[in-house]
Amino acid sequence: AREWRNAQEPVGDSFQPGHPELAKHIIQHFVNQNIDISVTNKLQDDIGAGHAFAFLYRQILPEGNIPIIPLMVNCFYPPNQPTVARCYDVGKELRAAIDSWESDARVAIMASGGLSHFIIDEEIDRIALAALESKDEETLKTLPNDRLILGTTEIRNWVTLGGAMEDMTMNLIDYQPCYRTLAGTGCAMGFATWS
């Protein structure tokens, strides 16, 4: 799409520019690599893009003038959530698609979403973060699906990014398990860059 609506913007509507040319290139690359993908040029008006994208728009791209291509991984809705191995491989192909695009444009790849939540699982968070830092593809591809439950499933976004950035080094900026209750509920927050 030429632009994406952020329906969760607190004041009025917000539209972000898209990049149809690169999007079509990525889609065709995925099809050529036998990666099943769904495509939409319009989101439901009263829903727009989800909060994971809205956070990036407001915090990372506040001017709203950089074209974006939202790639949504089904982290939450069973029964067809991708395995972490599939996520890693899709990330690799995303990077291959971008690298094969004949353009001088600079492209950044970002991911958002939890580490563990709504019940914090520091162990699985730390395993995933350590594997991303050490470029441990085997560990990333074999994270136990039975531990990727509730919001913790969003670790799939991190694994997808790890596949895309496998030739770069991750710099963990911070990891904070933010507990809300003594029962262990809350949200673990992680922030990292790759270079």
Each model region followed by its residue ranges:
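A structural signal for small-residue-enriched, beta-sheet-centric alpha/beta enzyme cores
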Residues: S116-F118
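Flexible, D/E/H-enriched segments
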Residues: A1-K92, A96-S100, I120-S195
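Beta-strand elements within well-structured catalytic alpha/beta cores of enzymes
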Residues: L71, A105-G113
